[in-house]
């Protein structure tokens, strides 16, 4: 099935309570598949086409604020419209899930795939000092697997989590093993697992207030410090990455998502030409695997960062490597996906 279809099936199977979205290419199959599957008739999951992306993210705010596992999906221009809501969720510590099946920009741009929303996702695209947990799938299987993972991380840390995919992964078809079916949680289970949620106040506890607003500077600073401490805990415990053919590698290609899939073929071609190169694939774009990449760079002659953008993740790679090895970037723009041999040629330039 398509990556987008896998997202839809995974939403139902992981016990999600609600989906709020708005059609936009190249992710429209997600809400279309949910409409065909009619989960409201089986599990009771709500599926609603909102009037806009702004409405959709605020529906996620409300549903997640009540302790529900709710999700929204969109593509780059639509996710741009959601940034205020995502910032509000981070400030109020509300655990929703957002899926971005990226397309090229800026502006309305193109419907072709891109990875140009990396900065927006990993730096916090709205106002304020906050971070969103960002997972980058590189296969249809990971599209399915990362939905439940995103929910688990979001609720573990009371923080928004994003699956940052792109039009290649969303539209391509692969075999996939769907996750096991989990029942939706009961109201009693939600009350036990989410004591912070706004689900009605029993006499045994004070009122739960969920807001990002605080007008006393010293209190607001304390809240920000607490958020930063939480983000550091996430950095310390939730980094995920994958390495391939690194045992004898002199050079490294760093790539995520669909670019990593292309890089795998580039590495195969390069090794046939006698170039010993391996792949480092960040799975969490935030938190970024900077310590792991720092240690790896100590033993390598050079690093090529392959992206479908003008050079975004390469900045995090350079910060992580910190001058221990040369770092160069190769990317294509405007929705053009790089060919494996183009990456090999960029690698040869790095070697020279």
Positions of the model-derived regions?
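Redox- and metal-dependent alpha/beta enzyme cores, enriched for Fe-S-associated oxidoreductases
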Residues: 241-276, 280, 286-292
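Thiamine diphosphate
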Residues: 29-123, 133-155
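Peripheral docking tails and interdomain loops at the edges
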Residues: 307-352
């Amino acid at each position: 099935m398509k990556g987008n279809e896998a997202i839809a099936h995974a939403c139902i199977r992981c016990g999600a309570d609600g989906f709020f979205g708005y059609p936009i290419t190249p992710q429209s199959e997600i809400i279309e598949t949910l409409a065909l599957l009619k989960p409201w008739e089986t599990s009771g999951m709500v599926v609603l086409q909102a009037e806009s992306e702004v409405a959709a993210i605020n529906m996620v705010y409300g549903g997640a604020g009540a302790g529900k596992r709710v999700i929204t999906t969109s593509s780059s221009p639509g996710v741009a419209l959601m940034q205020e809501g995502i910032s509000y969720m981070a400030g109020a510590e509300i655990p929703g899930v957002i899926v971005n099946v990226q397309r090229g920009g800026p502006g309305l741009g193109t419907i072709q795939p891109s990875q140009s929303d990396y900065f927006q996702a990993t730096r916090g695209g709205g106002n304020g000092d906050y971070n969103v947990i960002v997972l980058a799938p590189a296969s249809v299987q990971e599209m399915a697997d990362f939905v439940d993972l995103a929910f688990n991380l979001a609720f573990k840390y009371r923080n928004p989590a994003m699956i940052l995919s792109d039009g290649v992964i969303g539209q391509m078809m692969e075999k996939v093993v769907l996750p096991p079916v989990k029942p939706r949680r009961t109201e009693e289970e939600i009350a036990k697992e989410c004591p912070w949620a706004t689900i009605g106040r029993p006499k045994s506890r004070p009122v739960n207030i969920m807001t990002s607003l605080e007008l006393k500077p010293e209190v607001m600073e304390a809240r920000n410090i607490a958020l930063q401490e939480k983000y550091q805990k996430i950095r310390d415990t939730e980094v995920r990455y994958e390495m391939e053919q690194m045992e004898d590698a002199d050079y490294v290609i760093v790539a995520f998502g669909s670019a990593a899939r292309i890089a795998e073929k580039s590495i195969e071609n390069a090794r046939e030409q006698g170039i010993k190169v391996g792949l480092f694939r960040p799975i969490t774009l935030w938190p970024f695997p900077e310590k792991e990449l720092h240690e790896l760079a100590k033993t390598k002659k050079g690093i090529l960062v392959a992206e479908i953008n003008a050079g975004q993740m390469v900045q995090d790679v350079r910060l992580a490597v910190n001058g221990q090895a040369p770092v160069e970037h190769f990317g294509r723009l405007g929705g053009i996906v790089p060919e494996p041999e183009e990456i090999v040629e960029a690698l040869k330039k790095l070697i020279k």
